[in-house]
């Protein structure tokens, strides 16, 4: 089955107000730039967003804050966005901060059909408040629940027409997990090759988890913070 699309509307026309979206990427690396821009332009609102972070003021998920399209975000780091800071302090957005490893495991559990699991991470901190806890072998654990979403919006380096994906470097971090835990996955890629061209050992995410593939013409790949040194 050829999963390649040339218009994101074909893949995202069913996305509606109040949906939960799982957005891949780490910082600004490996984010689905085109899907985020689509949501921004369509004005879809009251979204529940699950992502490692929330972009910056004018790029990535940060642009969805401009029109207050995000109702709730589950993330592990949100410190690079002034608009986000303002909305959080004013009670305009619900924020659930989650340890990075726990967030990854919540998504993995969702994709694997595991409803919940116990972890020692967060015991004795604010993270544990309101969560069930149990002791195993003399050590305390808290119950974490799996995360699933209506749409998984991800970015990969290469795909074949069947949706088998190859990621590069840091982009492999949360993108596969967001695909696995979503009902519908839309993958943005830089290159598409015919089915059978990818070596099976090269594939990072099987196409069974991907419903749509969209080839971006030009990804900005912005650097969050650029540090240079003086010429010697």
UniProtKB/Swiss-Prot annotation:
Enzyme Commission number(s): 2.8.3.5
Reaction catalysed by this enzyme: a 3-oxo acid + succinyl-CoA = a 3-oxoacyl-CoA + succinate
Keyword field contains Phosphoprotein: no
Superkingdom of this protein's organism: Bacteria
Record has Phosphoprotein as a keyword: no
SS bond list: none
GO-annotated molecular function: succinyl-CoA:3-oxo-acid CoA-transferase activity
Gene3D superfamilies to which the protein is assigned, alphabetical: Glutaconate Coenzyme A-transferase
Chain positions recorded as CoA binding sites: 24-30
Keywords on record: Transferase
Signal peptide: none
Pfam families linked: CoA_trans
Quaternary assembly: Heterodimer of a subunit A and a subunit B.
Family membership: Belongs to the 3-oxoacid CoA-transferase subunit A family.
Protein name stated in the entry: Succinyl-CoA:3-ketoacid coenzyme A transferase subunit A
């Amino acid at each position: 089955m050829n999963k390649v699309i040339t218009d994101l509307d074909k893949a995202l026309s069913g996305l509606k107000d109040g949906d939960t979206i799982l957005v891949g990427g780490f910082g600004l690396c490996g984010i689905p730039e085109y899907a985020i821009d689509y949501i921004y332009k369509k004005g879809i609102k009251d979204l529940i967003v699950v992502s490692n972070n929330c972009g910056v003021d004018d790029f990535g998920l940060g642009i969805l804050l401009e029109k207050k399209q995000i109702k709730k975000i589950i993330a592990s780091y949100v410190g690079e966005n002034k608009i986000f800071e303002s909305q959080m302090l004013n009670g305009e957005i619900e924020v659930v901060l989650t340890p990075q490893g726990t967030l990854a495991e919540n998504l993995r559990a969702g994709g694997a059909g595991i409803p919940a699991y116990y972890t020692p991470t967060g015991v004795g901190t604010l993270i544990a408040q309101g969560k069930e806890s149990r002791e195993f072998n003399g050590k305390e654990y808290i119950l974490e629940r799996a995360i699933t979403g209506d749409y998984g919006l991800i970015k990969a380096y290469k795909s074949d027409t069947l949706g088998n994906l190859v990621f590069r470097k840091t982009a492999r971090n949360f993108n596969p997990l967001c695909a696995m835990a979503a009902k519908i996955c839309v993958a943005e890629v830089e290159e598409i090759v015919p089915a059978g061209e990818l070596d099976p050992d090269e594939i990072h995410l099987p196409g069974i988890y991907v419903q749509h593939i969209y080839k971006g013409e030009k990804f900005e790949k912005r650097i969050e913070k650029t540090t240079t040194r003086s010429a010697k």
